[in-house]
Protein backbone atom coordinates (compact mmCIF):
# COMPACT_ATOMS: atom_id res chain seq x y z
CA UNK A 1 0.00 0.00 0.00
CA UNK A 2 1.16 3.53 -0.71
CA UNK A 3 -0.23 6.94 0.01
CA UNK A 4 -0.66 9.39 -2.86
CA UNK A 5 -0.49 12.94 -1.60
CA UNK A 6 -3.12 15.41 -2.81
CA UNK A 7 -3.69 18.96 -1.69
CA UNK A 8 -6.41 19.76 0.80
CA UNK A 9 -6.92 22.80 2.97
CA UNK A 10 -8.09 24.26 6.23
CA UNK A 11 -10.34 27.23 5.45
CA UNK A 12 -9.74 30.16 7.82
CA UNK A 13 -12.05 33.17 7.77
CA UNK A 14 -13.84 35.67 10.02
CA UNK A 15 -17.43 36.09 11.12
CA UNK A 16 -17.99 39.63 9.90
CA UNK A 17 -20.75 40.28 12.43
CA UNK A 18 -18.75 38.91 15.38
CA UNK A 19 -18.92 42.07 17.49
CA UNK A 20 -22.66 42.33 16.88
CA UNK A 21 -23.49 38.81 18.09
CA UNK A 22 -20.82 37.92 20.65
CA UNK A 23 -22.36 39.37 23.82
CA UNK A 24 -25.91 38.21 23.09
CA UNK A 25 -24.77 34.64 22.39
CA UNK A 26 -22.66 34.53 25.56
CA UNK A 27 -25.60 35.90 27.56
CA UNK A 28 -27.86 33.10 26.34
CA UNK A 29 -25.18 30.51 27.08
CA UNK A 30 -24.78 31.91 30.60
CA UNK A 31 -28.53 31.51 31.19
CA UNK A 32 -28.51 27.85 30.20
CA UNK A 33 -28.18 24.96 32.62
CA UNK A 34 -26.11 22.72 30.35
CA UNK A 35 -23.73 20.22 31.90
CA UNK A 36 -20.04 19.45 31.63
CA UNK A 37 -17.91 16.66 30.17
CA UNK A 38 -15.33 14.67 32.12
CA UNK A 39 -13.88 11.70 30.27
CA UNK A 40 -10.41 10.74 31.39
CA UNK A 41 -9.39 7.18 30.57
CA UNK A 42 -7.10 5.21 28.29
CA UNK A 43 -9.06 6.37 25.23
CA UNK A 44 -10.13 9.97 25.97
CA UNK A 45 -8.71 13.01 27.73
CA UNK A 46 -11.65 15.39 27.80
CA UNK A 47 -12.52 18.00 30.40
CA UNK A 48 -14.98 20.68 29.27
CA UNK A 49 -16.70 22.86 31.88
CA UNK A 50 -19.91 23.55 29.95
CA UNK A 51 -21.34 22.35 26.63
CA UNK A 52 -24.58 21.38 24.88
CA UNK A 53 -23.34 18.60 22.60
CA UNK A 54 -26.16 16.30 23.78
CA UNK A 55 -28.72 18.54 22.00
CA UNK A 56 -26.51 19.58 19.08
CA UNK A 57 -29.13 18.53 16.52
CA UNK A 58 -31.85 20.76 18.04
CA UNK A 59 -32.27 24.13 16.31
CA UNK A 60 -34.53 25.84 18.85
CA UNK A 61 -31.85 26.85 21.35
CA UNK A 62 -31.90 30.64 22.02
CA UNK A 63 -28.21 31.22 21.33
CA UNK A 64 -28.38 29.22 18.11
CA UNK A 65 -31.19 31.39 16.76
CA UNK A 66 -28.76 34.32 16.98
CA UNK A 67 -25.76 32.48 15.58
CA UNK A 68 -27.06 30.26 12.80
CA UNK A 69 -28.36 32.84 10.27
CA UNK A 70 -25.11 34.81 10.53
CA UNK A 71 -22.95 31.71 10.33
CA UNK A 72 -24.71 30.28 7.29
CA UNK A 73 -24.13 33.49 5.34
CA UNK A 74 -20.42 33.51 6.21
CA UNK A 75 -20.08 29.77 5.59
CA UNK A 76 -21.61 30.11 2.14
CA UNK A 77 -18.76 32.37 1.04
CA UNK A 78 -16.19 29.85 2.26
CA UNK A 79 -17.68 26.76 0.66
CA UNK A 80 -18.12 28.64 -2.63
CA UNK A 81 -14.38 29.29 -2.62
CA UNK A 82 -13.71 25.53 -2.63
CA UNK A 83 -16.21 24.70 -5.34
CA UNK A 84 -19.43 23.89 -3.50
CA UNK A 85 -22.83 25.56 -3.42
CA UNK A 86 -24.82 24.02 -0.57
CA UNK A 87 -23.92 22.94 2.96
CA UNK A 88 -26.27 20.84 5.09
CA UNK A 89 -25.75 21.51 8.79
CA UNK A 90 -25.99 18.37 10.93
CA UNK A 91 -24.88 19.51 14.41
CA UNK A 92 -24.01 22.79 16.12
CA UNK A 93 -22.93 23.11 19.75
CA UNK A 94 -20.85 25.28 22.07
CA UNK A 95 -18.04 24.35 24.46
CA UNK A 96 -16.73 26.50 27.32
CA UNK A 97 -13.24 25.89 28.66
CA UNK A 98 -11.92 27.07 32.01
CA UNK A 99 -8.40 26.71 33.38
CA UNK A 100 -6.99 23.26 32.59
CA UNK A 101 -9.91 22.15 30.42
CA UNK A 102 -8.95 20.21 27.32
CA UNK A 103 -10.41 18.22 24.43
CA UNK A 104 -8.26 15.27 23.42
CA UNK A 105 -7.60 13.77 20.00
CA UNK A 106 -10.80 12.96 18.12
CA UNK A 107 -12.61 13.11 14.76
CA UNK A 108 -16.15 13.99 13.63
CA UNK A 109 -18.84 12.57 11.37
CA UNK A 110 -19.95 14.14 8.06
CA UNK A 111 -17.82 15.86 5.40
CA UNK A 112 -16.58 18.90 7.34
CA UNK A 113 -16.27 20.18 10.86
CA UNK A 114 -14.87 23.36 12.33
CA UNK A 115 -14.61 25.91 15.11
CA UNK A 116 -15.82 29.48 15.62
CA UNK A 117 -13.78 31.27 18.27
CA UNK A 118 -16.56 33.21 19.99
CA UNK A 119 -14.70 34.13 23.18
CA UNK A 120 -10.96 33.83 22.76
CA UNK A 121 -8.81 36.13 24.93
CA UNK A 122 -5.14 36.38 24.04
CA UNK A 123 -3.22 33.36 25.29
CA UNK A 124 -6.09 30.87 25.10
CA UNK A 125 -5.32 27.33 23.99
CA UNK A 126 -5.29 26.62 20.28
CA UNK A 127 -6.56 23.89 17.97
CA UNK A 128 -4.18 21.30 16.50
CA UNK A 129 -4.98 19.30 13.35
CA UNK A 130 -3.12 16.23 12.07
CA UNK A 131 -2.33 15.59 8.41
CA UNK A 132 -3.50 12.06 7.48
CA UNK A 133 -0.73 11.89 4.88
CA UNK A 134 2.35 12.33 7.10
CA UNK A 135 0.85 12.74 10.61
CA UNK A 136 2.42 16.17 11.03
CA UNK A 137 0.54 18.42 13.46
CA UNK A 138 -0.59 21.90 12.40
CA UNK A 139 -1.37 24.43 15.13
CA UNK A 140 -3.98 26.93 13.92
CA UNK A 141 -3.14 30.57 14.71
CA UNK A 142 -6.47 32.33 15.26
CA UNK A 143 -7.92 35.35 17.03
CA UNK A 144 -11.37 35.95 18.45
CA UNK A 145 -14.02 36.16 15.74
CA UNK A 146 -12.24 33.76 13.39
CA UNK A 147 -13.73 30.49 12.21
CA UNK A 148 -12.18 27.49 10.50
CA UNK A 149 -13.51 24.51 8.57
CA UNK A 150 -11.61 21.33 7.72
CA UNK A 151 -12.29 17.71 6.69
CA UNK A 152 -14.06 15.95 9.55
CA UNK A 153 -11.88 12.84 9.27
CA UNK A 154 -8.75 14.78 10.29
CA UNK A 155 -7.63 13.93 13.82
CA UNK A 156 -7.57 17.10 15.94
CA UNK A 157 -7.66 18.37 19.52
CA UNK A 158 -8.06 21.43 21.73
CA UNK A 159 -4.98 21.97 23.89
CA UNK A 160 -5.26 22.48 27.68
CA UNK A 161 -6.64 25.94 28.38
CA UNK A 162 -5.16 28.80 30.38
CA UNK A 163 -6.83 30.69 33.22
CA UNK A 164 -8.92 32.77 30.80
CA UNK A 165 -12.32 31.38 29.81
CA UNK A 166 -12.61 30.26 26.19
CA UNK A 167 -15.92 29.71 24.40
CA UNK A 168 -16.07 28.08 20.99
CA UNK A 169 -18.87 26.96 18.71
CA UNK A 170 -18.36 23.77 16.70
CA UNK A 171 -20.36 22.38 13.81
CA UNK A 172 -20.58 19.38 11.53
CA UNK A 173 -21.89 19.68 8.00
CA UNK A 174 -21.96 17.83 4.72
CA UNK A 175 -22.00 19.07 1.14
CA UNK A 176 -25.15 18.50 -0.91
CA UNK A 177 -24.03 17.72 -4.45
CA UNK A 178 -27.51 17.46 -5.96
CA UNK A 179 -28.58 20.01 -8.61
CA UNK A 180 -30.04 23.31 -7.44
CA UNK A 181 -32.87 24.64 -9.61
CA UNK A 182 -31.65 22.53 -12.49
CA UNK A 183 -28.05 23.70 -12.23
CA UNK A 184 -24.95 21.81 -11.11
CA UNK A 185 -24.15 22.56 -7.47
CA UNK A 186 -20.44 21.84 -8.01
CA UNK A 187 -18.41 24.72 -9.42
CA UNK A 188 -16.87 22.92 -12.38
CA UNK A 189 -15.70 26.21 -13.88
CA UNK A 190 -13.01 26.38 -11.22
CA UNK A 191 -11.77 22.95 -12.32
CA UNK A 192 -11.91 23.87 -16.01
CA UNK A 193 -9.91 27.03 -15.42
CA UNK A 194 -7.04 25.14 -13.78
CA UNK A 195 -7.26 22.01 -15.95
CA UNK A 196 -8.49 23.14 -19.39
CA UNK A 197 -7.13 20.11 -21.22
CA UNK A 198 -9.26 17.54 -19.45
CA UNK A 199 -12.36 19.03 -21.06
CA UNK A 200 -10.93 18.67 -24.57
CA UNK A 201 -11.94 15.68 -26.75
CA UNK A 202 -9.56 12.77 -26.32
CA UNK A 203 -7.46 11.68 -29.33
Protein language model features and the residues they cover:
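Short, well-ordered beta-strand micro-motif
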Residues: 12-14, 149, 172
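Hydrophobic, well-ordered secondary-structure segments
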Residues: 18, 28-32, 63-81, 130-133, ...
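Non-heme Fe(II)/2-oxoglutarate
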Residues: 1-82, 102, 199-201
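Short, cationic low-complexity segments
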Residues: 189-203
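Catalytic core of non-heme Fe(II) oxygenases with the double-stranded beta-helix
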Residues: 87-154, 159-160, 165-168, 175-187
